[in-house]
């Protein structure tokens, strides 16, 4: 008799994705982040669902409803802070996951990579709209500043912004639609993640060496299931520590003040995970130029496969490229720091320099470095 998990139409899909899936025997802990992202998404959907049961998307009551969740709902404070800090955890895993893809050349799986970039955009949109919902000062002004950027689009810009706002300013209509979009997007993300996996399983996983691993595969279960559980436990313990000891460490104190359209906060800044893009946006004095740079800073990931000039896939055996990669990481950390600083000397200059270096490394320095390495290897 054949095992039911290999014959049942539903079990068969689960089996070929998580149980009998052939996986390279040498994939390191950097390959854990996919499963961690899945866990983050499930956790965000669940905590978000319970928050939505008590939240009201009305400008008059939104802030009070969040206060009510934290004060009066059983473990409401825990659900809220798990959701808020879960987003930070989500982005930490996302950035590490993308970084792994860049380092080991996983972007050569074109469909998987491009859907991944789409996923990144979708998660960023979700997080931005979620930040608006508590209707604190930073929520309101963040929404105003970021949506206003669309007015830089020639000809249709102003109409587009007013259409998104549902009026002539960020108001009740904006909050209601942002809540609707914030609720639906995670399910779209989940569907996209399914397609992401579908395309990944067409080719099989990459591995640290970047070489073909068909000759040496092991079943996903029990080897990588247990490895993923360990990763999940580490992540959950980190998240629990953050939520239970310093839940407001990554938040903005301004968001504990109810939204006031008549009072602009001295420093408007997004959550930490958007600061690098915000710094790139601010480093260009022209509005349209800034918006283009902002979008391109992430869209540039899509053309990375075209810029791959190396004869080897992974950076494992390419010390010069490794060096450039870590300079890029340091540059992104610098941009993140600058994004949170006021617009004044010397931060403006540092931001402009870091932005130029970011695009230079990706577009020119990395491909040239790879070509030099090819020459050195007489390849």
Curated annotation (Swiss-Prot):
Its main location: mitochondrion. Keywords: Electron transport, Heme, Iron, Membrane, Metal-binding, Mitochondrion, Mitochondrion inner membrane, Respiratory chain, Transmembrane, Transmembrane helix, Transport, Ubiquinone. It is a multi-pass membrane protein. InterPro entries: Cyt_b/b6_C, Cyt_b/b6_C_sf, Cyt_b/b6_N, Cytb/b6-like_sf, Cytochrome_b, Cytochrome_b_C_euk/bac, Cytochrome_b_N_euk/bac, Di-haem_cyt_TM. The chain crosses the membrane at residues 33-53, 77-98, 113-133, 178-198, 226-246, 288-308, 320-340, 347-367. It is found in: Mitochondrion inner membrane. Binds 2 heme b groups non-covalently. GO terms for cellular component: mitochondrial inner membrane; respiratory chain complex III. GO terms for molecular function: metal ion binding; ubiquinol-cytochrome-c reductase activity. One of its GO terms (biological process) is mitochondrial electron transport, ubiquinol to cytochrome c. The keyword Cell inner membrane does not apply. Gene3D superfamilies: Cytochrome Bc1 Complex, Chain C (1.20.810.10). Heme b b562 binds at residues 83, 182. A ubiquinone binds at residue 201. The keyword DNA-binding does not apply. Heme 1 (or BL or b562) is low-potential and absorbs at about 562 nm, and heme 2 (or BH or b566) is high-potential and absorbs at about 566 nm. Component of the ubiquinol-cytochrome c reductase complex (complex III or cytochrome b-c1 complex) that is part of the mitochondrial respiratory chain. The b-c1 complex mediates electron transfer from ubiquinol to cytochrome c. Contributes to the generation of a proton gradient across the mitochondrial membrane that is then used for ATP synthesis. The cytochrome bc1 complex contains 11 subunits: 3 respiratory subunits (MT-CYB, CYC1 and UQCRFS1), 2 core proteins (UQCRC1 and UQCRC2) and 6 low-molecular weight proteins (UQCRH/QCR6, UQCRB/QCR7, UQCRQ/QCR8, UQCR10/QCR9, UQCR11/QCR10 and a cleavage product of UQCRFS1). This cytochrome bc1 complex then forms a dimer. Belongs to the cytochrome b family. PANTHER family: CYTOCHROME B (PTHR19271:SF16). This is Cytochrome b. The gene is MT-CYB.
């Amino acid at each position: 008799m054949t095992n039911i998990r290999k014959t049942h139409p539903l079990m068969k899909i689960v089996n070929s994705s998580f149980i009998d899936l052939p996986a390279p025997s040498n994939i390191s802990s950097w390959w854990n982040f996919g499963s961690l992202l899945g866990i983050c998404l499930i956790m965000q959907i669940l905590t978000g669902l319970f928050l939505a049961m008590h939240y009201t998307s009305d400008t008059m009551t939104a802030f009070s409803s969040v206060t009510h969740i934290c004060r009066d709902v059983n473990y409401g404070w825990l659900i809220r802070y798990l959701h808020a800090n879960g987003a930070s955890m989500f982005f930490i895993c996302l950035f590490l996951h993308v970084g792994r893809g860049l380092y080991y050349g996983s972007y050569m799986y074109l469909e998987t990579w491009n859907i991944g970039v789409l996923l990144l955009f979708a998660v960023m949109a979700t997080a931005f709209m979620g930040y608006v919902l508590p209707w604190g000062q930073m929520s309101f002004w963040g929404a105003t500043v970021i949506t206003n950027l669309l007015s830089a689009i020639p000809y249709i810009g102003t109409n587009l912004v007013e259409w998104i706002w549902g009026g002539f300013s960020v108001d009740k209509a904006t909050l209601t639609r942002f809540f609707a979009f914030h609720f639906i997007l995670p399910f779209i993300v989940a569907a996209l993640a399914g397609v992401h996996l579908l395309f990944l399983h067409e080719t099989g996983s990459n591995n640290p060496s970047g070489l073909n691993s068909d000759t040496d595969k092991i079943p996903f279960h029990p080897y990588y299931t247990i490895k993923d559980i360990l990763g999940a436990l580490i992540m959950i313990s980190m998240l629990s520590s953050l939520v239970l000891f310093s839940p407001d460490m990554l938040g903005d104190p301004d968001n504990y003040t109810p939204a006031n359209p008549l009072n602009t906060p001295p420093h408007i800044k997004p959550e930490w995970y958007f600061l690098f893009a915000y710094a790139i946006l601010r480093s260009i004095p022209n509005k349209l130029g800034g918006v283009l740079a902002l979008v391109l800073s992430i869209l540039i990931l899509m053309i990375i496969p075209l810029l791959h000039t190396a004869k080897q896939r992974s950076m494992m055996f390419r010390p010069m490229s490794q060096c450039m990669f870590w300079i890029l990481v340091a540059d992104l950390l610098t941009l993140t720091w600058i994004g949170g600083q006021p617009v004044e000397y010397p931060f403006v200059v540092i931001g402009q320099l870091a932005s130029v270096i970011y695009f230079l490394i990706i577009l020119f320095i990395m491909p040239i470095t790879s070509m030099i390495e090819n020459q050195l290897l007489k390849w």
